[in-house]
Amino acid sequence: AIVSSPEIAPIYAEAFGIGESRIKPIGTPRTDVFFDCDYVAAAKERLYSQYPLLRGKKICLFAPTFRGANVHDAEYPESFFDCEKFANALGTDWAVIIKMHPFIKKPVQIPKSVSNRVFDLSTEREINDILFITDVLVTDYSSVIFENAVIGNACVLYAPDLEQYTDGRGFYFDYSDYSCGSVVYSFSELPQAVLAAKPGEAQRKFKERFVSLCDGNSSARFVETILESKK
């Protein structure tokens, strides 16, 4: 198995019940594309061409994980996020992109009053492409925080149901360990947290701990590891 940093190797070994010597901290090959300037530029241009109202805006990506046991009952409670109030609180300099988990099939209801500033991109296959045009990521318990840390965007964690979610699924680490920016627990706190968000020391430490080897060379290290194992 391969992991994205040396520090999490013991966690993976325990989780999968294998010896730590079989865990290779070499980075995540799929993140190498983040360092491909041509790919990033093309992804940005594709999104701006498809959604021209995003051009010139600061962009907040709202990308929560699903609630429920599986794909059949997956949802995100509407009471957690009011896109109209959120967009109005951020102001007209901002655009809000909503990217729901693929398990959630119900389209996001966007009021006409903010339809020029709030966009449902849940059908976009690659959330990472959206991260390339993002200024601030808002998520909760999603693994997108790791890709976002590699790219270097600011991040706000919004966890209105932390206790309930922890009881139901749990985490490998304490939730506070995943903090790569500010953490808020109520919707009323969220807009100001986004407006104040910027990459900082917390994000640097998070990146060093969890994704330090995602540096654009993970695929090369993966090939080297395979070749070494054949000797």
Spans of features found by a protein language model:
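Short, well-ordered alpha-helix to beta-strand connector turns
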Residues: 9, 20, 93-94, 115, ...
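Conserved catalytic-core segment of nucleotide-activated headgroup transferases in glycan assembly
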Residues: 23, 29-110, 184
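C-terminal alpha-helical cap of glycosyltransferases
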Residues: 215-231
